[in-house]
Regions:
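Glycine-rich and polybasic anion-binding loops at the starts of cofactor/ligand-binding domains
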Residues: 1-196
């Protein structure tokens, strides 16, 4: 069952679900997917990712990347941005890291509206649409104009598969303003023995 999202992201999710209904899952006859049997992924019972997990800071510490103590660390749990486990170590005049919902409702609303899901315009397929439809409140990163951000931004994507197969759809929108530089490293981690 589809979960209705309030606010500006609701229309984005609704359009993506309509696109998925029209496009369906890609099959081997689609060039980009000819070596993948995507339908096999959906034979298991799926759990849509939620924040309600037992993942703690102690769990996170096991997966931290090198020099994490000086980097900005942004955490997704089951596809949902988790500010409580995230640490922004850059100054606000250099880097903004907020929820996608906050960006869509604030100073970056126009940018979010113009760019969120833009890749579907030139790469329409069912998996892309499904990802967008179930992308819960994601992450927005903005590197401010002219700023050279020397320390990296680490994004940790944790899937807690202990309760079962997790269908998590992390979504990050990055805005690098003119003459700014930014380094981002992402890590994908599954906790538990089930697939995610």
């Amino acid at each position: 069952e589809e979960k209705k999202k309030p606010g500006p992201l609701a229309g984005f999710s609704d359009k993506a679900m309509a696109d998925f209904r029209k496009l369906g899952l890609p099959a081997m006859r689609h060039e980009e997917w000819k070596y993948a049997r995507v339908s096999n992924l959906f034979r298991n019972d799926l759990r849509i990712g939620t924040e309600e997990t037992g993942i703690t800071q102690a769990d996170m510490d096991k997966f931290r990347l090198p020099d994490a103590d000086s980097a900005t660390e942004l955490v997704f749990i089951n596809g949902i941005f988790n500010p409580a486990l995230s640490v922004v170590r850059h100054l606000p005049e250099e880097l903004i890291a907020i929820s996608l919902e906050e960006a869509a409702n604030g100073d970056y609303a126009e940018f979010v509206q113009a760019n969120l899901g833009h890749s579907a315009d030139y790469h329409p397929d069912g998996i892309h649409a499904l990802n967008a439809a179930f992308a819960n409140n994601g992450l927005f990163i903005a590197a401010k104009k002219g700023k050279l951000i020397e320390k990296p931004v680490y994004i940790y994507n944790l899937s807690d598969s202990r309760p079962g197969f997790i269908f998590a759809q992390p979504r990050t929108l990055v805005h690098v303003e003119a003459a700014a530089q930014l380094q981002i490293a992402e890590q994908y981690i599954t906790i538990g023995g089930n697939e995610s």
